[in-house]
């Protein structure tokens, strides 16, 4: 983890205990901004990923992910996973079922930016199966 921390300018943060039930593996959370727009640096240990989930909103909403260190993946339901490396940006519209997490053999950190929306909420769903995750390249 120390080598990974040296790759980025954002803090790794504290163990993400508040959301641990929605992750397979250990993750860490560092709030970067909590006013106007929520921005959090999320760090995943190798093999860690979050459950499938949906960011709901009546209008607007969604999430933006910006990889800041390591290597990871983002996947929308029904589509192939997309590899993320530092500098890659993923725009996730509201109502899209998806997951994101680290590559099996590398740490991964991304900024998670909450897109403001009307009546926004998150719905956490089932874990990403080992079979699904095992298909990653």
Where are these regions (language model features)?
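A short hydrophobic beta-strand segment most commonly corresponding to one strand
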Residues: 91, 105-124
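Short, conserved beta-strand element in jelly-roll/cupin
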Residues: 42-45, 56-74, 113-116
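Short acidic-glycine-tyrosine-enriched beta hairpin
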Residues: 78-95
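Asparagine-centered strand-capping/turn motif at beta-strand->loop junctions
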Residues: 101-103
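Conserved SET/PR-domain catalytic core that frames the SAM/AdoMet-binding pocket
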Residues: 41, 45-47, 93-95
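A short, N-terminal "cap"/entry segment at the start of jelly-roll beta-barrel domains
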Residues: 1-40, 51, 121-137
């Amino acid at each position: 983890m120390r080598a990974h921390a040296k790759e980025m300018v954002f803090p790794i943060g504290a163990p993400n205990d508040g959301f641990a039930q929605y992750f397979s593996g250990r993750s860490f959370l560092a709030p970067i901004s909590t006013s106007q727009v929520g921005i959090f640096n999320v760090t995943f240990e190798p093999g860690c990923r979050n459950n499938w989930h949906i960011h709901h909103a009546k209008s607007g909403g969604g999430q933006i992910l910006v990889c800041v260190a390591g290597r990871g993946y983002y996947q929308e339901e029904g589509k192939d996973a997309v590899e993320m490396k530092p500098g890659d940006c993923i725009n996730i519209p509201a109502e899209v079922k998806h997951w994101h997490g680290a590559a099996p053999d590398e740490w991964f950190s991304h900024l998670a930016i909450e897109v403001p929306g009307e009546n926004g909420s998150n719905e956490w769903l089932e874990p990403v199966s080992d079979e699904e995750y095992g298909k990653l390249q």
